[in-house]
């Protein structure tokens, strides 16, 4: 079971609490986690990554074990602590403005 923490606006859209869980078999990567999340909560499609390219949206960041992994390859394996459910995979909305 992978634990995922979503930003407030996506929790509201998906009508979920602070943390959601996805069950995965095989390799655990950011791409696989996001795909499982979008399958479980279809209303999130296009909010985290682009519809056609499946690339991360510019103002969305991914964190694993306290590290920003947003610019890592999306098919890179996530840390064991995420895979074992000891730590959550964080999806954060970046703050921008002037």
Describe each model-derived feature in a short phrase:
Residues 1-97:
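Ubiquitin-like/PB1-type beta-grasp interaction modules and other compact soluble beta-rich domains
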């Amino acid at each position: 079971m992978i634990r995922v923490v979503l930003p407030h606006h996506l929790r509201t859209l998906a009508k979920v609490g602070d943390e959601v869980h996805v069950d995965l078999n095989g390799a655990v990567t950011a791409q696989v986690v996001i795909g499982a999340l979008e399958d479980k909560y279809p209303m999130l499609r296009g909010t985290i990554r682009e519809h056609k390219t499946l690339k991360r949206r510019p103002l969305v960041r991914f964190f694993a074990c306290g590290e920003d992994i947003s610019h890592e390859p999306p098919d890179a394996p996530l840390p064991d602590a995420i895979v074992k459910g000891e730590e959550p995979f964080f999806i954060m909305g970046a703050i921008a403005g002037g």
